[in-house]
């Protein structure tokens, strides 16, 4: 397959603060995720030319703000997509945290707005609101939060949030504020997105479904006089051949049992997130029909919440599938793979030359006598570049 010409997009990687390993659904091949390992991934993503990294949020994860503030000084260009949590935070406190971190890391902060879609976890955090009430809180939160970051004094008495003489004394580096990313597939979520955020995110659904969602969100935003950009969250399993990539996908779930799938799907079923419901419907908890669209594999979603699909294939095939998403309006790809350190290298080395992200071109390669030609032969000869396997 010939790699298509692709418009430039942003590609972000992922810091696995909830765990990492070679396989899903088992401790076999598991890996300690400590500060040193997270720093390794961040530095690799920085040097490889990724635009940024997403840090997950929730009780199964290390706190994203603490991790970002610890890791960011070890990188130079990498941006950090960190979550604010309406309903769990005061918008004024969140604004101070945002401005402080943005200043400390030189304007490299991106903000992920997470409303929360698991009622059980929400109650554990003290939030007892219904689905639509949480989006009411999100709207009020973002209005106050954005105004504070933009330098305004805020006085508001809303249904859920009341602020008197709210001010931010020390502004962020980015003006008027760091970009806001947000995902919400329900009517309430789309309504909030159209009014308040900069980039709308979707899970990795088939291109036709993504196109439908993008068109719907774009139309609602245009009715409000606003224009949004769009991103997608996906896993990637890329190898030098399609056969090797599909073998790697099968191997990723080699230890996943039917009991493990049933237990995971039971947890997902209790959630009131429309996006999670759409993810679960793609595979129905069955492992016999996991290729839900050409080269889009739903095996991850058998046991993992949130992002449950992966692009699987050789570099040219994966680049072609990325182009399909670009053609329907996606300009940002938030990616991950298991294990995250190795797969960050694999995707960048195999696919970046085909998709040519602008941000990767800003990286000055480190000079080393072992690259990029590979290991010397017999301590004397350099490998012939013409014989090298080309991505």
Swiss-Prot record:
Superkingdom, taxonomy of origin: Bacteria
Keyword rRNA-binding on entry: no
Family: Belongs to the SsuD family.
Keyword entries, A-Z: Flavoprotein, FMN, Monooxygenase, Oxidoreductase
GO biological process: alkanesulfonate catabolic process
EC number: 1.14.14.5
Enzyme class, UniProt record, top EC level: oxidoreductase
Species for this entry: Rhodopseudomonas palustris (strain ATCC BAA-98 / CGA009)
Keyword Transferase applies: no
Catalytic activity, as annotated: an alkanesulfonate + FMNH2 + O2 = an aldehyde + FMN + sulfite + H2O + 2 H(+)
Matches recorded under SUPFAM superfamilies: Bacterial luciferase-like
Pfam family, one: Bac_luciferase
GO molecular function (one): alkanesulfonate monooxygenase activity
Ranges annotated as spanning the membrane: none
Function: Catalyzes the desulfonation of aliphatic sulfonates.
InterPro entries from the UniProt entry: Alkanesulphonate_mOase_FMN-dep, Luciferase-like_dom, Luciferase-like_sf, SsuD_RutA_monooxygenase
Name the record gives this protein: Alkanesulfonate monooxygenase
